[in-house]
Amino acid sequence: MDYFDINIIRTLKFLPGILLGLTVHEFSHAYVSNKCGDTTSKDQGRITLNPLKHIDPLGFVMLLVAGFGWAKPVQFNEKNLQNPRTDIMKIAVAGPLSNVITAIVLSWILALSYRIHPESLYTVLAEVFLYAIYINWGLFIFNMLPLPPLDGSHLLLNYFRKYPGLYEVLYRYGTFILFGLIIGSVFLKINLLPIWPL
C-alpha cells in the first residue's frame, strides 16, 4: 500500500467527524438565532442536521486538501432579535459549545464501548470516533479565537462596541491576522492554530 492509498484511507476516517462537527456547529447557530426571534435561518432551511444544508463545497474541499476550511455561515438579522446585544453572544457561542458537547458525548460512548469490549478500542470505528473527538475540540478552540469572522470575535467585538476606534481596528484587520495565522500554520508547518493535518 503506497502513501496515496494510506492518505485516502486516513481522509475517509476523518470525513464523518468533519461532517458531524460542521453540521452540529451550524445547526446550533441556526437553532439559537431562531429561538432569539430571528427566523432567517428557518426560512433558509438551516434548522436541520442535514449536512448538505450547511456544507460549503469550496470550504469542504479546502478542509480536506489544506487542513482548514469553512461551512456556510448562518445568517441572521440583528434587528429581529429580542435582545440584540446578548442574543448575538448566545448565537455566537452556540456553535463552539455544540462542538464541546459533541466531543464529550463521543468520548463517553467510546469509553463505554471500551469498558464493555476492551478490544473495541483498536478497531477502525474507534479511530473514526477519536478523529471526530479531535475535530470537534479543534472546531471549538479555533472558532473561539477573537478574530473576525470567527465566533469568538462576536463576543469580543460586542464588548468593544463601547470603543469605536478599537472596534473598527479589530473588525478591519482581524480577518487579515487570521488569514496570516492560517498561512503560517499550513505552509510554514508551524502549529499557530488548532488545525488538523489531513
Positions of predicted regions on the chain:
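Hydrophobic transmembrane alpha-helices and their immediate loop junctions
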Residues: 1-198
